[in-house]
Amino acid sequence: DYIDISDQDLEELAVKITQSGINVEKVITNHIDNLVIGKVISCVDHPDSDHLHVCMVDVGKSEAIQIVCGAPNVREGLKVIVSLPGAVLPGNFEIKKGKIRGVESNGMICALYELGLEEKNDETYAKGIEELNSDAKVGEDPIKYLGLDDTLYELDIHKHRNNDCYYHIGFAYEIGAILNRRVVLPQDSFKEVNDSINNHFNLDVETEKCPYYTARMVRNIKIKESPDFIKRRLIRAGMRPINNVVDISNYVMLEYGQPLHFFDKKKLGDKVLVRDAKEGEKVITLDGKERILSSADIVITDGEKPVCVAGVMGGENTEVDDNTTDILIEAAIFDPVSIRYTAAKLDLRSEASIRYGKGLNFEYTDKALKRACHLLEKYADAEILTDIVKHDKVDKTIKTVEFSPDDINKLLGIKIDEEDMKVELGRLDFAYEYKDRKFTVTIPRRRLDIDPYVNDIAEEIGRLYGYQNLVSTLPVVPIRRGDYIGDVKYRKQVSKRLRRLGLNEAKTYTLISPDMAKLFDYEHKEKVILPNPMSIDKSVVRTSIIPSLLNVYDYNKKRKVKDILLYEVAKTYDKSYNEESKIAGLLSGNYISNGWNFAKKVDFYVVKGIVEDLLDYMGFKNRYSFTAGGVDDLHPGISAKILLDKKEIGIIGRVHPKILKDEVYVFEISLQDRPQVLRWSCG
C-alpha cells in the first residue's frame, strides 16, 4: 500500500534490510501443499464417540472424501479448510490416511492455528475449525482466499530504531531508503456534517505530561463486522478482529504507530479533563480489573472521575459497545517515561502503552486522526463533526545539522564524494542544502531516533552505503609514553589525598530523579532532562554530586552501616553544554571508630578540617575563606560557603533536618580553578 516492492525477491530484500541495520530474524511464508477449500455435504455423529463427527467433504474432486472431525462447530453446508493426505503442517505434522476409532479418515478439517496462523478471528472458534464465507470456491487454495498468502518478516528492531520502525509506514520509509523508492502515504478525505464538536465537548489539560491532545467527534456509527482486508491484516499482525470500530483504531495504530482511543460519547459526557492521578484514585479498566493509581500516573477524566488510564488502557465506564452510536476519538501524546512507569507498575503492557512509551511524532498524530475519520466514514457510516479540539504544547523545534563531506568521511574512514552523499540523503528522505562544501540537513520529525549531530548522519549514510563495503584500515596513532594528563591527572591527585584522609571513594550515576535534582541546586543551573530515559529515577542529569551521595547514604543506612565517610570526584553538566569537575563528600557517624577507648564523631569542624587540608594540598593556602549560611538545603546555623579569592567555589555544612533528621555533613568544591603548575606528582 505504501511502497511498490512487487519486483523484489523477498528473500533477497530481507538480506538488504539486515545489512542496513535491522535484523530480519525470520522470513515466514504460508504456502502448504495439498491444502484446499472444502464443503461439508453431510455430517453425522461417530458411532463410537460422544464428540467426534463423520463428515463427507467435497474438495473439488470427482468424489467426496470422508473425514472424521472433532470440532464442535462442524456441520453440513459449512465451507472449511481441508488438509489432504501428503500435506505437512507446522511442527512437521504430516497428514495421512488412517482410522479414528474404527472409521476411515482421509484428511483433516483445520483451524487457522493448526496451519501456523494464530487464531484471532473470533473467540467463538477458539476450540473449533475455521468457518469460511459462502463465496469460498471449493478446491481452491484457502490461504490465498483468506488473503494470508503474503510473506511476513519477523524483525529484531534495535532500541534506537523503535520510534520509527515500529509501525508499517515507518518501516516502509526504511525499505524506501534501501531501494531508493518513494513512499506513498494514504490520501484520506471525508465529508463533515454541519455541526461543530465545540457544541458538544470541552477539553482541559492540567498536566505537563500531556503536551499534545487532539479529539474529533463522530456520530451515528453502525457497529458491524470489519471488511475482510482489515480483518486479515489484523490477524497477520497478531490481533483479533472484534468489530469495525475497534478494528479501525487498531489498524490505524499499526499504520502510523499512533494509538487512538474511542470513548462512547454518551457515557463520557461533554467534558474531558486530563490531569495527574490522585494518590489512591481507582479506575476499572477495559479488562475488568480495578487499578489503584498514584500521582505519577496520568488519567483522562470526565471532569471528575477517571475514565481512562492515559496511554495504557481505557476505562470500563466509557467503553464502546454494540449500542454505541456516537464516539469521541482521542489522538494524543503523553510523556513516555510516565507511561512506561505506569504500565510497569500496573503490570499492564498494552499495544498502546508500548508505543506511547517509545515517544510519538505529533505530525503522525494528526494524520492518524484524519485516517481514522476516513475509515469510520467508509466502513462504519460515521458522520464526522467539524473542527478539532486541541491542546498543543508540544516542542516543534526542527532539528538541523551542518557538516562537510570530510566530516562524514573522517567518521566512516572511507571516501564518499558529495554527489553520492546527496543521493544517500535523498534516499533517506532528508531535506538538505549544499553550499560552500557544507551540508545543512533537516531531520524528518518521524526520525525521533536521530539527534542533530554529525555522528548520527554519518551512521545513516554509512548503513545505506553498506557497512559490508567499508574497507578496514589501521588507525594512525602516534606512540608516546603513557601518563595521565590534564584534568584526569588533577582529579586523581585530589582523590588520592582524600583517601589518605580516611574517606572512601564512591562512583555513582550521573543521572538522578527529578525530586533529587531539586536538592542542592545552589548554583541554579538549568538541568538536562532526558527525553527517553530508562526510568524516572534516572531522568535528570545532575548539576551537583551531593544528591547522588545522599542516595548512597540511604542505601548504606538501610543495611545498618553506621559510619559513612564518602567522597566522589566527577563531572556535572547543565543545559548550556557546560561540564564542570567537582569533588563532593558526605560524612556521618564516627570519623575515628572506637579504639584505645577513643572515638571521634563527625561534626562541622571535622569536615571543615578535611576541606582545609584539601584546599591547602590543591595549592590554595591563604587564598580561601568561609562565610556562614546562605545555602537552602543546609542547616542555617551549621553551614558555610567556600570562597576562593572572594569567589564562591563550594559549600559545606550539615544537611538540613527537613531533608535528613540524621546528623549528616556534606561538602562540594568546584575543581575548575586550579594552579597552572602542579607541585606534586600523581601516585
Model-derived segments and spans:
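Glycine/proline-enriched, intrinsically flexible loops and inter-domain linkers
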Residues: 2, 30, 53, 179, ...
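Long, charge-dense accessory insertions within large macromolecular proteins
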Residues: 3-9, 17, 21-27, 39, ...
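Phosphate-backbone binding interfaces of nucleic-acid-interacting proteins
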Residues: 1-195, 328, 345-351, 355, ...
